[in-house]
Each structure stands twice: as C-alpha cells, then as structure tokens.
A protein has these predicted regions:
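Conserved class I S-adenosyl-L-methionine
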Residues: 155-193
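Short alpha-helix
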Residues: 205-229
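A short acidic, Gly/Pro-enriched loop at the edge of an enzyme's catalytic core
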Residues: 116-126
C-alpha cells in the first residue's frame, strides 16, 4: 500500500499536519497535560470495562499521538509500547513517561510498518483509540498488521468515531458525504480541534471513511474473531454545535432530536 505514490504523498501531508500540532496539543487546555502528569486518567470508563484488567499484560497502542492513553494503561499495570508516525509526538510521549516515572517504549513508525518496527514482537493487547481509522487508507492491510502483532489468545480493542456520524454535515444532521466512499476527503482547515484559533501553516489533511462492514470484513479476513461490539449515542467532543454537554463530560443530542450513533467499540481475539 505504501508503495503507492499517492498514498505516500497523502501520508506525508498528514504527518506534516500532525507534527505541527503536537506542541499545540501538549501545551493547550484541550489535553490538559499538567493534569495528566498529575494523575488524571484519559481512558473512558467503557474502555476499561471492555478491555478488562491489564496488569502485567503487554499492550501496544497504535497511532498513540503523544502518549496520554498509552501511559494511562501503563499506570494500570500494563507493559506498554506506543507507536506513531509523528516524531515530535513520540518525543513528547517519551518526555511525559520520564516525567511521571513510568516505564514505556515509544517508537516512531507508520502503522503499516509496525510489525517490522517492533521487531516482530507480539502483544497481549493491540489498542487503537478514538479518531484512528480515518487516517488510514487501507483497513485490510491494517488488520493484517494487527494480527501479526497479537500473540495467540491476544485481542484487538478498537474504539473509534462511528462512520455514520462522519458522513453528516458539520452544522446539521444532513448527509453530506458518501458512507461508501473509496477516495479520501481532502480538508484544508487552519487550527486544530484542540484549539480552533491556533496559528498553523500545514492545514491540509486527507481522511478516509470506512464503513462498519469494511472494518468487520478486514478484521475477520485477518483471522480474528469479533467477540463484542457496541455503539454509543454520545461523543467526547461537540461534534455539532447543538449537542448538550452532560455532567459526565459526554456530548449528546438534545432530548427533542433523534439520536444517532456517534462512537463504536469492538474487541476481536486471535485464536490461541
């Protein structure tokens, strides 16, 4: 896949965007890095419930950004490795691990090259967090990488934005994008979701929509078994301006509007 010239160009464009935004995210209010360093947990309760006890288990976090979720798993006793294609993000993750005194391994690599970058190591858990798959053009190749990274009996845990929510317009519940699109959507937007007013220069990104059927088929074709699947009617950020913020920090539709799935999660195991 990465031998395709277009894919390589898209990845490099996305990498430049993420590289530029790392210091904005590390120092901004959205991620609250001081609070995290002081002990704040960044994982969602449903993630902890569905993953279960990680004490003593090996866990690799793909597309880990600057490592908050990775290190949250480490604080729970997992032996963690974080991987991301952004060198500045990995530098920030390593600095955070050193600052809080947590043993963690962070590696710079494209996710498609993860097995080689990690020396063909295998893990008990492959964790993929919210907002990951839209950055990948080929989920079938991604699922094969996941399967290579899992030891027999290990499992993938994926938590992500629901593709249904991704096809809707930014200001309404009107369908604006194709659910079954095969080409990436090109965006050109200054700032970042963490700070809309931030001054940035690398503002172009490419995102790929992936239908649930595409994700499920890729995971099954890689030889994994889907053990559980859940959909959620809330988001972790104001996806639309009319969403209501609840006391638990989630964002939900007003009571007079129909609900739509905004997130999903699944767990898929590799046969022992």
């Amino acid at each position: 896949m990465m031998q395709d010239d277009r894919a390589r160009e898209w990845f490099e464009t996305n990498r430049a965007n993420w590289d530029e935004r790392v210091p904005i995210h590390v120092t901004g209010r959205f991620y609250d890095q001081p609070g995290f360093l002081a002990g704040r947990d960044t994982l969602q309760p449903f993630e902890r419930d569905e993953v279960g006890d990680v004490a003593g288990k090996t866990l690799v976090h793909l597309q880990c950004h600057f490592g908050q979720d990775t290190l949250s798993w480490a604080r729970s006793g997992a032996r963690v490795t974080g991987l991301d294609f952004s060198a500045p993000a990995i530098e920030a993750a390593r600095a955070a691990a050193a600052q809080i005194g947590v043993d963690a391994d962070f590696v710079v690599s494209n996710v498609y090259d993860a097995a080689e970058a990690l020396g063909e190591r295998q893990f008990d858990i492959v964790y993929v967090g919210i907002g990951s798959l839209i950055w990948l053009p080929d989920v079938e190749a991604w699922a094969k990488v996941v399967a290579r990274l899992l030891r027999p009996g290990g499992f993938l845990y994926l938590s992500d934005g629901h593709p249904m929510a991704q096809i809707l317009a930014d200001e309404s519940l009107t369908v604006e994008h194709s659910y079954f699109a095969t080409e990436p959507t090109r965006w050109e937007e200054p700032g970042t979701y963490a700070d809309l007013d931030a001054v940035t220069t690398h503002n172009v990104t490419y995102e790929w929509p992936h239908a649930l059927s595409e994700v499920f088929s890729a995971i099954l074709a890689a030889g994994l078994r889907i053990d559980c699947f859940a959909e959620r009617d809330y988001a972790l950020y104001p996806r639309w301006p009319f969403l209501d913020r609840r006391d638990d920090g989630t964002w939900r539709m007003p009571s007079d509007m129909p609900s739509v799935p905004l997130m999903y999660s699944l767990r898929a195991s590799k046969p022992a």
